[in-house]
Amino acid sequence: MRHQNKNHKQRPSFLSQFLVILWFRTKLSIRDKKFFILGILLPMISIGASIILNNVLVFGPGSDFQKTNNNLNNNNIFITPKTLNSQQETLINTMKLQYSLNYTYLDDDTDLPNYIENKSLSSLDYGISFIGSNGINIYYNSSIESIPSFVHSFFISLFKINGINLQLNETITVLSSEVTFDAFYLLMPMILQYGFVFFIPYFAILIVTDRDKGFKNHLILNSLRTSVYWFGNLVFDYLIFLIPTIIGWILLYSFKIDGIYSDNSGKSFLLFLTFGISAIPFGFVLQFIFDKEETANKWLYPFTSIVTSIPSALISVAFPTSTPLIVELLLSILPTFSFCNGLKALTYNNSSTVSYTILIQLLSGLIYLILIYFIDNYKKPKKNEIINDEDSESIINNQIIEDNDVLNEKEKIKRLVRDGGGNNNNNKKNNSYPKIVVDGIYKQFIQPKPTLDKPSIIERCSGGTKATKKNSIIKKAVDGIWFSVEKNEIFGLLGPNGSGKSTCLNLLTGLLKADQGDGYLSGKSIDKDKDVFQSIGSCAQNDILFENLTIYEHLYLFSRLKSITTTKSELEDEIDFYINKFSIQSFKNKKSSDLSGGTKRKLSVACCLIGDPQVVLLDEPSTSLDPISRNELHSLIDELKVNKSIIMTTHSINEINQCCNRVAIMVDGKIRCIGTPNHLKHKYGSGYTIDIIPNNYLNNSYEIHNFMAQTFPNATRVERLGRFISYDLPSQNQQSLSTIFRILQSNKQRLQILDFSASSSSLEKVFLKFANLQEEINKQQTNNKSNIINNNNNNNNNNNNNNNNNNNNNNNNNNNNNNNNNTNNNTNNNQLIN
């Protein structure tokens, strides 16, 4: 039994929709292999590499030993300067008494470092350079025991001067080289950074996919709040980020990794947490650069790696211990740089740097959130500046007199809007107002006039020239239409390709923005009210389904987004009702990627209708369905129209006849007729239609035409489609259909007619009349474009010819001038000779 939603006018709360988005993203993620690789595996690999690196580059254990008798005998020692003060002399003499050393005094101006450098390693051991009365420089051989032994002996001698016998124990620990020591502090932050950097493009590409495949708009059109979409994705991505982050930090702390296992361990944990707060919104900002999933997959990973990681690597090499403050501030806008800089500060126990890095990551995260809000609003569809171009008006279009029914509908809508019928408050007070009101919406597309000329460099760099009447072709996709849809009514938009019906639906769903006019859904303005889609069900022409969700999960998602159900059983009843109605029980637990085209279409319509939306927008709902399924769908839509206002675009006359209470036929962006199917059939139908197929068109068509003119004087030849010759008989014709049939049958052999048919005019014939009109308009527009190209080419040729003529004239003038000059010169020469 189906649960009737008593709260269908209300939209679920922010929290309810937020929880649905978390559930939805969880389902998609656990079925995505890329999620486990980039979201879990890579971060854990980087953490494991850091632990291994810390154990491999260990700085010990070395060896401990004691020396009570340091034998420095026979070692060489160089002393400078020669002249020493009394204290310095006493120190040297004491050392002479203690140890049998080979003392060499160098000249006062001797540069001891250079002197030692030029000596062979075997001949030098130690050097002492006295600087003034206080300073002493000690030079020593880099052999492992030289400096401890010499310092040991030096201090024993120093204390001996004061009569103190000093006993020192030496402990020598073998350490790795200085380069190896610094390598860990350089590599560990970079390795951790690279492990976590791929979170950024992975989450960002999911948003690009939503936008490219229409998922985002589809969810919003089906009652999801825009704020819930962004907030839900941000929170879910951050929760996923926390899984490897917390596990990884615990492992790093357990293995006592330098910087993590320290007095700053609390700050190190906060550094990891705040990195996600900054990095995820940063990725969401980057994704606005891309419109296609394929392009984002190709470029976002290397782009993110270069932009965020290369600066960190360069700074780590250029400033291994301390980065200049101005450089840090400039690059801190990049989350991975801040993260790497904070990790480096941890390894050097720089607590203050870690603290302000945490603050920077929090601040940058806030900045990116603000950017997301403004960019998302900026990228929404915009109005075009209306360019009135009389030349773009179709001659055929101008010759058509607007239908009285269309004019009456227009006046009704204008009066309704003027009286406040489109206003939200008035709509609440008076439930009799139409749920859908279209008030003169107008949309034009502007294209540059075709030309063979290449744009200039300036035009290419600036994105082209500004659209004007002279350099543009204006296509009026929707040329000012007015209509309304009442409750419990299905309104059909019928028209050939290019007539503007799909554009009209895109304007009502917010995918396009009207250049003029407005629409109202349940009393809310499409142009002005942000929550206009709070009780909407939308089914696009192409199936917008999530490949990794089952049929049941799709219906669960859209039901939770659109309806308020009090219990789980009510929700189950609602889902089961639509599964049974659409006869898709056997595919209930199948993913949409495994469904046939017809089953996918059924699921799309079911997702649109579930949740009892007040306004339903169906774009060719019976596409891909077989005839039986199509008839079942028509019956189902008619059954479920209670308390709904439905707009349906279609090419099918049968769909109009079976489903629609009223229909509007669109041609070239305008509504040409509007009313019930029967009203249009009687108003525009011509009584009867006769179709004749001659044995030989060339030989028999003239005789057939003369026969029709004599027998049926009011008959009008309409068209020739292949071998068919069609005639319309007006309703004023006095002969019945049976009489017409008998006359044609009796003359069939004489006129050499292969076959014929006679029938009452149908809505299909009415539609074909307007379709022919659309075809003539399209031909005229094509001819106009060809004429524009020819005119441009002729102008270019004329300009070239004029330039050539000017060049020829210039050449002739130059030749004449030269001849005149030669004549004058000859005359002057003759005069000189004479």
From Swiss-Prot:
Signal peptide: none annotated. Residues 779-789 have a biased composition (Polar residues). SMART domains: AAA. GO terms for cellular component: ATP-binding cassette (ABC) transporter complex; intracellular membrane-bounded organelle. It is a multi-pass membrane protein. It comes from the Eukaryota. InterPro entries: AAA+_ATPase, ABC2_TM, ABC_transporter-like_ATP-bd, ABCA, P-loop_NTPase, R2_ABCA1-4-like. One of its GO terms (biological process) is sorocarp morphogenesis. The chain crosses the membrane at residues 35-55, 188-208, 235-255, 269-289, 297-319, 324-346, 355-375. ATP binds at residues 495-502. GO terms for molecular function: ABC-type transporter activity; ATP binding; ATP hydrolysis activity; ATPase-coupled transmembrane transporter activity; lipid transporter activity. Residues 779-834 are annotated as: Disordered. It is found in: Membrane. Residues 790-834 have a biased composition (Low complexity). Keywords: ATP-binding, Membrane, Nucleotide-binding, Transmembrane, Transmembrane helix, Transport. Residues 452-693 form the ABC transporter domain. PANTHER family: ABC TRANSPORTER A FAMILY MEMBER 10-RELATED, ATP-BINDING CASSETTE TRANSPORTER SUBFAMILY A ABCA. Belongs to the ABC transporter superfamily. ABCA family. This is ABC transporter A family member 11.
